[in-house]
Amino acid sequence: MMTYIVFILSIIFVVSFVGFSSKPSPIYGGLVLIISGAVGCGIVLSFGGSFLGLMVFLIYLGGMLVVFGYTTAMAIEQYPEVWVSNKAVLGAFVMGLLSELLLACYILKDDEVDVVFEFNGMGDWVIYDTGDSGFFSEEAMGIAALYSYGTWLVIVTGWSLLTGVLVIMEVTRGN
């Protein structure tokens, strides 16, 4: 049952990216990005990453709502263009959906998905050796590594997000 849920969430994830790539108006593009972010958090949650899914949902989608709230307020259109108002945009959306459908049918026909990345074992994922303690949580080690080894990464990421918001606000404000 969980495999089907992940498969359906993956299809919704890719279809939402097709909808974003053929966006006719920034309002709908932001909405589709928010939906795809929420579905991506659901996929992470289904694989057991409860903390990571929650953090991505709060930080990424919170930032997305703020950025698209500002840009939508500054660059609002009286009659926004939808997917069916232009034949070229509708054609791009339908072609993207058909290619996703064909890919899904190809995967279901072969009943297997090849893994691109191969790891020798659990040792490639583990940062600290826990000995013979049995069960351990990977999330706690990832959070510890992020805030101990990745302090500069957190600072640079926060600074680039702030710069991105300021650039987007300046571009959409115009003259």
From Swiss-Prot:
The keyword Magnesium does not apply. It is an enzyme of class 7 (translocase). It catalyses: a ubiquinone + NADH + 5 H(+)(in) = a ubiquinol + NAD(+) + 4 H(+)(out). Keywords: Electron transport, Membrane, Mitochondrion, Mitochondrion inner membrane, NAD, Respiratory chain, Translocase, Transmembrane, Transmembrane helix, Transport, Ubiquinone. GO terms for cellular component: mitochondrial inner membrane. It is a multi-pass membrane protein. Its EC number is 7.1.1.2. The keyword Hydrolase does not apply. It holds the Pfam family Oxidored_q3. Belongs to the complex I subunit 6 family. Core subunit of respiratory chain NADH dehydrogenase (Complex I) which is composed of 45 different subunits. This is NADH-ubiquinone oxidoreductase chain 6. It comes from Phoca vitulina (Harbor seal).
